[in-house]
Amino acid sequence: MSGWYHSAHASDSLSKSPENWMSKLDDGKHLTEINIPGSHDSGSFTLKDPVKSVWAKTQDKDYLTQMKSGVRFFDIRGRASADNMISVHHGMVYLHHELGKFLDDAKYYLSAYPNETIVMSMKKDYDSDSKVTKTFEEIFREYYYNNPQYQNLFYTGSNANPTLKETKGKIVLFNRMGGTYIKSGYGADTSGIQWADNATFETKINNGSLNLKVQDEYKDYYDKKVEAVKNLLAKAKTDSNKDNVYVNFLSVASGGSAFNSTYNYASHINPEIAKTIKANGKARTGWLIVDYAGYTWPGYDDIVSEIIDSNK
């Protein structure tokens, strides 16, 4: 038996082994039924410039450390910097590494922990270099997705809503690149995912077979953002439909000063939402995408751990 209300192996302390917490779940669960912690602009940990960091740095741990801390959804954004290369970006800011760095780390991690699954969101976040002649999606598909170096790394099955058993040891693509020739993962259809800007919205994906429910109100201030996150959490809590995909962003755009930096917002939002998740107990949350994933503020609950432990 699979489904949200049953798990053969989940315990109260999944987060005690964050490096392999998925291995303790019923592998008949669909990924949409699993509460998954994610990191927003996952590659921004490389930023050292103090000015750029105020608004563009959203993580302080590298990919492997995020994975070991339990993060399983990675928000990767890029720029086509050559006809055979995607550079990782946060908007216009180059994050000093290429997409291959993430894929190499994911490949290494999944070989060490073959019962885990990684969901990778892929999005073009800045204009291509003037010399580039191919589309962003074409470069991704030809030089990464179909690259023999990453053979068997990506989930390539036909199930629009795969189970953990089907995706163990693999990356499942969450496609924000627009229309695509890639026929597996979330957003695998010719129209791709139609993403509303600064909004809470619903849209059909995978040729109408899945309902994507998103909260991504990144221009909100603290109170309104917390309210938006909690509203989607409340909907997920009472929803047992496995074909509904909940993606809830806790991130807020920086105002450009230390007072309203991404770090400062996260220091307030993450503990508040962690408290809500803890109070809800074993309940569906969906996928929560956070800034400073794995960072714990003294005296407060760790949001990644609370998301993991909320799984049944």
From Swiss-Prot:
It is found in: Secreted. GO terms for molecular function: phosphatidylinositol diacylglycerol-lyase activity; phosphoric diester hydrolase activity. GO terms for biological process: lipid catabolic process. Coiled coil: none annotated. InterPro entries: PI-PLC_domain, PLC-like_Pdiesterase_TIM-brl, PLipase_C_PInositol-sp_X_dom. Residues 27-176 form the PI-PLC X-box domain. Its main location: secreted. Residues 1-26 form the signal peptide. Keywords: Lipid degradation, Lipid metabolism, Lyase, Secreted, Signal, Virulence. It is an enzyme of class 4 (lyase). It catalyses: a 1,2-diacyl-sn-glycero-3-phospho-(1D-myo-inositol) = 1D-myo-inositol 1,2-cyclic phosphate + a 1,2-diacyl-sn-glycerol. The gene is plc. This is 1-phosphatidylinositol phosphodiesterase. SMART domains: PLCXc.
